[in-house]
């Protein structure tokens, strides 16, 4: 009875062993899932039922553990291949059935898109196991295939210095040295990397606790694949693949791969394309990185990579690579002999703050100067002449186009440029350097004579024209025989000297087209001195700007700034004699170059040709005006301001005949026009007796008045050129004086009908003071009574050169008469001095050139005469005697006293001497108007006070009429 209750005890462990075995059977199928190794053998730590466990291990647990181990081995290889190839190559994704979502491989806790492309290539590793079919080593090679290159393309490798190396040539050289090559590589592949994933051999049998070891193997593999995923993006091949993917490079640069079944035993003695050096370098060709070993019951898992340290490849042109090798551009063994500009060390550097002194030599011109724009072509280097005609001739060689050496005229040209504005412009036009490149321009003045404001300034040194800078020109006879060696131009025409119109070329050598004008009385001086000192050089020589090309002077461009001395001229002539064929027109290329250069110069010549008719009409008008004037003045007038031997005393319209000839003579034509009121200026004096009024001042008006006759003179007989004046904001009060306003006008009584229209508005044509006999008589009476008062008031004071004023007659009369209602009396064409013409300025402070007589001479004393006064013969004799004895200093002093005491001289037109209070009222107004117009003084002030005296004591520069007015107000014609 005791054993009966103990009978069911053995049945309990038996029943408990069944669920234990069934649970272990379920665990054998769990390795199909990555998380299956978590709950393996939960009841194994109890220490009981050891026999059933041992019997169960031999049956089912081994199969389940082996299945799990086989899954780990298979995914180990496939996952490594996906990570390596996805980082180098774009693999197409795979999709599940009925879904558009790409299938993702999540083994070893690394998510990556799965692909079906590698399924067949990795079939060997997908079907392997740990016991019977062990996997071979997985080898993945990435490489560049050169089969896609064309015949003119070459795969080159760049070293660390950027030098190009032919890859195929390096591979061929290595194959000759090592004919044996691995079977996996072809002859035209460049292997970049070689990956090796391998399961090592094991000598031990599978352990009994295989199920408990597999979760540890899985966890260790997660760390391996994460490091593989990261490190694969640090290698040079990945950088090379990404760069080509962005640039869309040549197809030959796309990385390709191949999966190779590796051999268990590597043969390192055989060279392969991975370890072949492509160029000489001190660095390693390849490097190897191992990811460590992961132990498993089936054997050690390992992964390593061998990669090229430099993957800088590109595809270049084969011919470019070959030529660079021949030229030695890469290895710097041979440098091409490219011409370099050598700077002459003997040439001094340019001065600081000045124009560049140096110019390019004849042999080394600047080619950049040849093309000024898209449509213009210019001759390179300095030209032999700036004339438009010689520009047509300049078809010679490049080196022979310049007659001078560099720097031959720089010093002297700059010295001239500092002296005068004209020379400065010429020096700027003539200087040439790589930094400052200037071309001669062709321009014309719109007028045949410059305006009055263009007269040379008195403060400039006597450099009248650009041509007066250099030495003398060749004389026309010499110049006529000098151009014989020049061949005829294609159009066989040069510019005419006077009208610039093309005509058949006269045989002359080295002569300027404008060196002298036509041989008529109106032409300029024959020699240089006369041409330089004439005031009418406005047509060809003065009107053209420096460097314009109109002045084809023998010594270079205008202003002679290229050749400034006779030595350079002689060298130029010698060079022309040596080079007889300098301007030969042989060859069609030279003719084509001429046609291109003719475009600018022909237009300039055509424009200047249209000025011929007006210039000829001007010359004829000037000639007739001169002849009529000289025939009317039959008192044997001579040029008093010029020495008798000075060239230029011959009458010429190019120079004002009566004015002292100087380089600063204003360019004013000697014909009546609206630019000048007095046609001809003549510093002459009559050599008759001293009782005539013309002896003191040479006034033909006094002769006409005393004789009572009427003479018709040249200016009134010639039709005036109607030159319109510019509109002005204010009345024409503050006008400059004209250079032609210094000659006594011989005007008849009936000029009243002509001169309001033919007289110059700028010289006050509306301000004529024609005094009647009654007015002159009353003026004489007041003059005799006021003599003592004005003499007591005179005090000598020095007078500046630009304030030698004369008191005009009608200023106070008009100024007071306009307020008091005094109407001028009948007009008579008479004047009282040579520098008081038919018109008179309004105020008495107009700037004259100085009075030749005393204070009460007719030139100064007439300022206090009213229009209704009369002049008696006694007064004329007394004033004439005083004028004959007056000196230059007295005239200056008296002229200044006239200006100072002008406010105290009342007009007799009011019936008698006014009170002193009324005299002082006008004085502030007169001086205020004088200060108001002080800025508009003439250019010619202050120059003529110091002129030479004539034999009777008169100052040559004192024939200055009151042509510049300083007062306002309207004056009605009387």
UniProtKB/Swiss-Prot annotation:
Segments of skewed composition (Low complexity): 12-22, 401-410, 450-470, 493-514, 535-544, 629-640, 854-870
Signal peptide: none
GO-annotated cellular components: Atg1/ULK1 kinase complex; cytosol; phagophore assembly site
Gene this chain is encoded by: atg13
UniProt subcellular location: Cytoplasm; Preautophagosomal structure
Name assigned to this protein: Autophagy-related protein 13
Disulfide bonds: none
Biased composition (Basic residues): 834-848
Highest taxon above the source species: Eukaryota
Keywords from the named record: Autophagy, Cytoplasm, Protein transport, Transport
Native organism: Aspergillus oryzae (strain ATCC 42149 / RIB 40) (Yellow koji mold)
